[in-house]
């Protein structure tokens, strides 16, 4: 297992870069109301596929979300298992905040998402920070052969989560992804995930890690290749044990 690597998290940098990029077009209220303004923009658009290719609201939404540090535990699980210098793919990258942290920590990061305002901003951020990294368009060719691929808070946006996992598994030796439990009042941008079935799919692989974070986010890391019956049994046991432990802790509170 690689030595512990500290990621440099600077939330103020997220806002500062967006301000610089947008200049006079920057709207502080949209950053402060990052969720509401995105919901409003989606309602006005009315077409999910078009929305993901045209949204400017995601510039604010993803910036504000990055500033919370919510995904830092996800990244720390990755760097515990994959050393700097490894080739990793940020799949569904948005504005690229996660991959930028990894790139500055010495990883060979590549990005993939639809061509949209978020990836145009990402290209600016890479140049602004003096970094070079490919930004692949999901509508075109996305390469494989990566040491690891991750997709954080992405799978709940797709129509077929199992096809999505297959896309990740084809591209890297290690897959890291999180599954969000549906909650009442969920945003219209999220599809309810069959979490139990997705965890069952993962358990048929060699499980490297499983954690339940933030009360509803099932984070899994697993090998994409074939595995033995014994390893599948171990993987299922680890998932069951973690869920039982978390449920017991929640009931004790």
Task: Give the ranges of each region predicted by the language model.
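A short, conserved alpha-helix within the catalytic core of class I
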Residues: 158-171
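Histidine-centered active-site/metal-ligand motif
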Residues: 157, 186-191
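Conserved beta-strand signature within the Rossmann-like core of class I S-adenosyl-L-methionine
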Residues: 172-184
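Conserved N-terminal segment of class I S-adenosyl-L-methionine
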Residues: 1-143, 165, 189-253
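Hydrophobic adenine-recognition pocket in adenosine-nucleotide-binding enzymes
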Residues: 154
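A conserved beta-strand element that flanks and buttresses the S-adenosyl-L-methionine
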Residues: 150
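Conserved protein kinase catalytic core
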Residues: 119, 159, 184
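Conserved acidic residues
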Residues: 86, 147, 173
């Amino acid at each position: 297992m690689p030595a512990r690597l500290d990621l440099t998290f600077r939330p103020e940098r997220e806002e500062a870069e967006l301000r610089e990029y947008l200049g006079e077009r920057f709207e502080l209220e949209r950053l402060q109301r990052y969720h509401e303004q995105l919901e409003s923009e989606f309602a006005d658009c009315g077409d999910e596929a078009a929305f993901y290719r045209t949204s400017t609201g995601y510039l604010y939404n993803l910036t504000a979300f990055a500033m919370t540090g919510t995904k830092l535990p996800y990244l720390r699980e990755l760097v515990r298992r994959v050393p700097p210098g490894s080739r990793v793919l940020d799949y569904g990258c948005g504005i690229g905040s996660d991959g930028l942290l990894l790139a500055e920590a010495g990883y060979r990061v590549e990005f993939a998402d639809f061509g949209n305002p978020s990836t145009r901003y990402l290209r600016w951020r890479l140049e602004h920070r003096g970094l070079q990294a490919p930004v692949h368009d999901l509508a075109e060719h996305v390469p494989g052969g990566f040491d690891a691929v991750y997709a954080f808070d992405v799978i709940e946006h797709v129509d077929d989560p199992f096809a999505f996992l297959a896309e990740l598994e084809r591209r890297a030796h290690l897959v890291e992804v999180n599954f969000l439990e549906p909650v009442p009042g969920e945003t219209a941008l999220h599809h309810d995930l069959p979490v139990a079935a997705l965890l069952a799919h993962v358990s048929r692989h060699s499980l490297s890690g499983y954690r339940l974070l933030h009360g509803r986010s099932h984070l899994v890391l697993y090998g994409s290749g074939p595995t033995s019956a014994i390893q599948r049994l171990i993987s299922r046991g680890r998932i069951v044990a973690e869920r039982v432990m978390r449920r017991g802790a929640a009931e004790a509170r």
